[in-house]
Amino acid sequence: MDIIIIDNITKSYRETSGERFVVFKNFSLAIKKGEFVAITGESGSGKTTLMNIIGCIDDIDDGKIIIDGTDVTSLDEDELAKFRNQKIGYIFQNHYLLRGFNVLENVLIPSIIKGYFFEKEYIKKAEELLKTLGIGEKLHREITQISGGEKQRVAIARALINSPEIIVADEPTGNLDPKNSEIIFNLFYDLVKELGKTCIVATHNLNLAKKADRIIDLSPQEVRIRELSENSTY
């Protein structure tokens, strides 16, 4: 079953010159429930724009986007914000963790936004996620006192705390060295697969992308399916 349907969309931005730069024109893509999809492509090819569109952060000029049966292009701002908070978890290259908060508190922020103020259920879930990601012993460490790789693990746990159906990850290991990048990506991949989440990851690292069920390669002039990994069941 397709959980994400991007139907014939067009997306453009207005440049400082006043002209419009078209990122996508008549672009369509379907992603199955539980699929792990990697988005690759050179800088400027539209990876981040596509992540923002799927993540309901950015709007489109034309076309339709259906996520888990809902036409999100028909929702107003409040409806879209509620839908996004319920259905989608985000991981960004710049993790945007909050200074002055410890590891556990940073993970719990999405649940607090939903109105669950440090409820035992969410605290336990956060502790389990952090333990699975290898930093369970640093729950109460201030966020500035952990390494870059550990911060990215916190960002992964934060994205999963509300049990979203879909994870959108834009260059989630882009700021890490190759060794830590591979370690964190593998932890992330295994956890997402174990939880049965649908995941879309933008990455410039083809070695990491090869773990995906499917790789979508974006180029300035066209979008094409680059390859289907051997482990794909789709």
Which sequence ranges carry the predicted segments?
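The feature captures the beta-strand-to-loop junction immediately N-terminal to the Walker
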Residues: 40-42
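Short coil-to-helix segment of the ABC ATPase nucleotide-binding domain corresponding to the Q-loop/switch region
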Residues: 101-110
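A short, proline-enriched helix->beta-strand linker immediately N-terminal to the Walker B motif
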Residues: 161-165
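Catalytic Walker B motif of ABC-type/P-loop ATPase nucleotide-binding domains
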Residues: 167-170
